[in-house]
């Protein structure tokens, strides 16, 4: 695995104030600019001899509407003693990828300065304006060196942005570097079968293991409708036979920053819809960060459509049983008006337009 940012942190002068920051999930917000740190990719250069670093992969973003659904904005802080912290983001951490070099925090009360020390150098992280984008990036040069660690929760939530709407619901693929629990009303599935024409999915529990791409039936069109609870650990196990692959980054910073991107090839299919039905379809360009996709054979259709065949939640019911069911096996109350979509009625597939 490539080094995530052997960042940063070189120094020399010891700072006296002890940082009191509990282990947990945070977003890191600059107190001067109001921008949040977002990790676009893990490409960072460090020159230990001079103490200079290139932190261009760590961009700063103003809009909470952007960061609320961007896993690159979520950091798990774990104290290592002596004001040192390991910072976990996406699929790795600073400490595990930098030979044990950890950043330190200098407490100012409600905010902190993030610094490091190496071979006589002390470097503070600063938020520097980017004139080209109107946003910013993290650097060890600059004056905006005070940061607020905002705990994840409440208004500072993590929500999933839909990719498509189909069969009467909003849907998204999603992969997190941390285990998480679905919000009420959401359901997760993994793809357990793929043919040239269709795919089948199987329902999972509400706790999803880390680093597992899944397909999620959402509550609504906004990330605020689709909140999840992040966890440092979980007893949930990875499903056997998951056919999905996942992405971590979709950096647009150019050069080697884009080495970790996944570009759509002819065999790849990303989540979409076909004729109102849930499908994996041909895509183009770079697949978005923290999403899932499947691979298809050279003879496969452009749109591989969801099929009721092989869905565990439906297989558990006798197809001759009377009643109306959704494609995920949920029985619709008798007399309820059906939204447009595909249903199983008395064992037969029906389409409501």
Residue ranges and their predicted role:
Residues 29-34, 41, 81, 89-93, ...:
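Short, flexible beta-strand-to-coil junctions
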Residues 1-4, 353:
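Positively charged n-region of N-terminal signal peptides that target proteins for export
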Residues 15, 308-353:
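C-terminal outer-membrane/trafficking sorting elements
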Residues 9-18:
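Hydrophobic h-region of N-terminal signal peptides that target proteins for export
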Residues 54, 59-61, 65-67, 72, ...:
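Self-processing/autoproteolytic domain segments and adjacent N-terminal interaction modules in large
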Residues 20-49, 63-131, 140-156:
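Extracellular glycan-recognition/adhesion modules and their associated mucin-like linkers
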Residues 21, 148-182, 205-311, 353:
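A short, polar beta-strand/turn micro-motif
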């Amino acid at each position: 695995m490539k080094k995530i940012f052997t960042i940063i942190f070189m120094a020399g002068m010891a700072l006296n104030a002890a940082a009191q920051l509990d282990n947990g999930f945070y977003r890191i917000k600059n107190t001067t600019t109001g921008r949040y740190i977002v990790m676009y990719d893990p490409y960072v250069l460090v020159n230990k001899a001079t103490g200079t670093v290139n932190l261009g992969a760590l961009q700063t973003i103003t809009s909470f509407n952007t960061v609320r659904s961007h896993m690159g904005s979520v950091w798990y802080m774990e104290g290592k003693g002596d004001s040192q912290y390991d910072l976990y983001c996406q699929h790795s951490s600073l400490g595990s990828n930098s030979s044990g070099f950890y950043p330190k925090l200098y407490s100012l009360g409600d905010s902190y300065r993030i610094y490091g020390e190496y071979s006589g150098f002390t470097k503070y992280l600063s938020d520097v304006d980017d004139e080209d984008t109107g946003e910013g990036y993290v650097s060890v040069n600059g004056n905006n060196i005070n940061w607020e660690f905002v705990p994840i929760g409440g208004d500072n939530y993590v929500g999933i942005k839909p990719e498509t709407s189909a069969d009467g619901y909003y849907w998204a693929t999603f992969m997190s570097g941390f285990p998480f629990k679905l919000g009420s009303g959401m359901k997760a599935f993994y793809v357990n079968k793929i043919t040239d024409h269709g795919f089948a999915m199987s329902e999972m529990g509400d706790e999803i293991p880390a680093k597992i791409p899944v397909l999620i039936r959402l509550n609504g069109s906004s990330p605020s409708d689709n909140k999840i609870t992040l966890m440092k650990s979980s007893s949930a196990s990875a499903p056997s036979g998951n056919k999905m692959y996942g992405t971590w980054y979709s950096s647009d910073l150019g050069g080697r920053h884009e080495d970790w991107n996944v570009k759509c090839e002819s065999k790849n299919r990303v989540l979409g819809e076909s004729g109102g039905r849930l499908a994996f379809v041909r895509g183009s360009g770079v697949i978005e960060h923290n999403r899932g996709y499947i691979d298809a054979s050279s003879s496969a259709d452009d749109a591989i459509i969801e099929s009721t065949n092989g869905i565990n939640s439906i297989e558990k019911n006798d197809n001759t049983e009377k009643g109306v069911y959704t494609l995920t096996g949920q029985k619709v109350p008798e007399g309820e008006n059906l939204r447009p979509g595909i249903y199983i009625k008395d064992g037969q597939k029906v389409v409501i337009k």
